[in-house]
């Protein structure tokens, strides 16, 4: 019986059943490959994205895979609205340049649905490179819908809390197109930067870093380019991930001039998207 909510092969979307793919992904049956060099069973396009396409929309939320410009494949950290009512997304700054067109890799058939309108570039490599590694995307309201829950990942709050979610050793999780949902302990933290032993690789840039259902960071990359997390067979043998803290991102946006895209960012309502 045809499953209308199972997308067939397409751009960065290849199903495999060979024994090597199953072994490297530690997955029986079909394995989805989405990023070159990743042997994980990648996150499949979720039902809610396909339903949004029925209404002519691309759906964006935490963990949505995105194309930025002509070459970059990244992950969206969060989507919502700014104080001017613009529909906004946040990803890693190194994913693209101002003016780059953006579209969802889960609904690539819909074409361009947003544009990078602001960014702060990385200032170096490794830990230095994560500072300010943020890009702001403005979506076309006629083509895009946003949600706080996407593919099983929910962002219900922004930034750290008095309850101590920001403490060292706190379990943090990220959702990226290359390696999916992976978790590990926070290892180091400053007001601008968080380092955690969480599996990630190229393609996961921009992904949400979560403490429970609170967004605490936007993934920038690994501490070094050595030993990225390419297969679950690696176990804990991969470099830690660096993320720009949500607190620093939104503090910077809120301090910007009125009218700056992203200023006064808020999450979508819990019942969004309202497609009908």
What are the roles of these predicted feature ranges?
Residues 1-87, 100-115, 267-276:
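Protease-domain processing segments flanking chymotrypsin-fold serine proteases, especially trypsin-like
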Residues 68-190, 211-212, 275:
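Serine endopeptidase catalytic core focused on the charge-relay Asp
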Residues 97-100, 204-205, 224-227:
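A short local loop/turn or secondary-structure capping micro-motif enriched for an aromatic residue
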Residues 112-116, 123-126, 139-157, 221-276:
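C-terminal cap/linker of serine protease catalytic domains
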Residues 195:
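FAD-site-proximal beta/loop scaffold in flavoenzymes
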Residues 199-219, 223:
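Catalytic nucleophile loop of clan PA
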